[in-house]
Amino acid sequence: GVSEMDMWRIIIQIDPTLERGFKVACKGSDIRLTASDDKQMLWLQYQLIKKISKEDPRIDGSDLPPALINLNDTCGSFAFDYQSIYSPYGLNPDQTGVIGLNNFDDSWGIWGHNLRKVLGKEAKKVYATIHGKTDDSQLCFSSENMYRQIESYIVDNFGEKGNSRFVIAPDDAPYACTCATCTALGNTEKNATPAVTELIIRLSQRFPKHFFFTTSYLTTQQVTDKQLPSNTGVIVSAIDYPLRRTDGKDEQDKKFAAQLDNWKKVTNNIYIWDYINNFDDYLTPFPILKIAQQRLQFFKQHGASGIFFNGSGYSYSSFDEMRTFVLSSLLINPELPVDDLIRSYFNQEYPVSKKWLYDYYTELENNAQSGKRLGLYAGIRESEKAFLYPDQFIKFYDEMGDFVSEAKGKERKKLHELQTALSFTRLELGRDHGFDAYGYAKRNGKEIQPVPQAQKWITQLKEHKAFTGMEYYNESAYEIDYYIKEWEQYLLSSDIKKSLFLGLNPSATPKLNKIDSKKLTDGTHGLPGDYHCGWVVIPGEECTINLPVKGINASGTFYISFLNLPRHHIYAPQQIQLLKDGIAYKTIDLKPEDAPEKGEMIKATVPADLNGAEQLSIKISCLKKPEAQIGIDEIAFIP
């Protein structure tokens, strides 16, 4: 047997009077843990196991993340009442309790704009009245029927006693219901706050043990003038609060602070819905940690009591485990040093590659402190401008193979997974850089030739099938396999082998920036499956592009290709006119499909003789549609 001398004695006590708090008291091998609720106690127990495992070889804590507390008398409190992270590691039910998060899937009886799921077929009975007509794009929140349906949903699924949270939010549409009852409550055309508030107060009185939240977003952006009951609150979306370094002092900071301060007058329960990913590209690293720390300190200062970090959901996202560990630590204490948290995670999980990973990732974080905005819906070029400096990234990517070979077991698998994901970033940088030093191709006179490495990047990305959650690369569920297929089809086996326009500098009306105008003649197709990939998008239903063709003196085929993607208001043209030195020369008529499922490439060609010509003008016109744009990827002249 084991003598008492060799045992740890641990006493556990839940004390609700400790506000959000926890306490550790140590006396030799006697340890007393006190916490204000189950969630903190669970977290505290895992912290303790991790700490003891460092001193006592009988206890294995290797599968637990680094601990934030020490084995001495200590006390503290969680910065927020509610914290969840919508990312693979943050949604893993085996991990949430360990890192002090609320389990998102269990926390909410109704979430976001999901009220319609609850209403089901009955929704049609509670459609809003907009401009005097029944309108299925929005719901009526003063309807007795709506109240009854939510009431029975709660009684049937959650009972009276539990403490679940429910979001009661209008649909993601700009108009509010203005039926007689809603109008009498105070609704106006774009403000649904009065009716929504009334419903929430009524539900909170009917179910005093549950919590009910409105949102501060679109039609409920306006703060109510009523004091809200203690079991109600608001979720404030930070979508319009730019994601960049903040010191709380610029106009955008003040604007967001004012919104929080106004809600603080009517409720103590203010949750923030903030963002931690680029939703158009989950695979390229997104250095959000230092920015998130500044935002958390700012939110806390202005009364926030809960945080929901919206990430990549169940889809793989580069560095997710490390980022989720750091963010969950900052949600407990926003003052913890970010670099130390990153280091402790890499040191534990990546024994071979820890320094190399730490150096590169913190370099990204420091790049993102330049003050440039991080794009929530960004293509590779925007990421490159903000933080992804190509020379740093390519060096890191090229060194990965050695670390994958050297590492073993779990570390090797994780590095291999990261290498696969970052092959997408390498392909995107290569595609965007065309035939320059970082590009996928080399130029040889009027031809471009893909470099042999490009095939390696693709082969590496194809391994994504071996990893969970790596089927899609963005929120719109764009498939990696489809991306690879288009890459092979349009870039590796391009139909433009040689173009006499290669490298010409076109000018355009409306005016284009230098990078965009070069894209038109870089011999590199865009990928129709993703409008971020290589398309020059020009606003309006007409544009003219002028090419300096003096000295070409040849006849051949004029070639131009367009993106047809009506879903994003990008329309292929109906007509293209060519003018030689200002004189009408040729006309091409096109009949693009109305609604292709995915983006499609539309090509137009016509024989042309440019002997003696100095300027070729291309006049492009599409159907007159609201918000129309024209997407072009390549203009070529094939001898």
Where are each of the predicted segments found?
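Short beta-strand-plus-loop segments that form exposed binding edges in beta-rich domains
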Residues: 618-626
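Catalytic domains of carbohydrate-active enzymes that cleave complex glycans
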Residues: 330-520, 524
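Structured mid-domain segments that build the active-site/substrate or prosthetic-cofactor binding neighborhood
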Residues: 145-146, 254-355, 359
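Feature activates predominantly on carbohydrate-active enzymes
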Residues: 17-209, 213, 233-236, 260-287
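Disordered, acidic Ser/Thr/Pro-rich linker "stalks" and the adjacent N-terminal cap
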Residues: 488-555, 561-572, 593-598, 627-638
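Extracellular carbohydrate recognition and processing domains
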Residues: 585-608
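Short, surface-exposed beta-strand/strand-loop-strand elements in extracellular ectodomains
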Residues: 569-582
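Short, well-ordered secondary-structure micro-motifs within conserved domains or adaptor modules
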Residues: 2-20
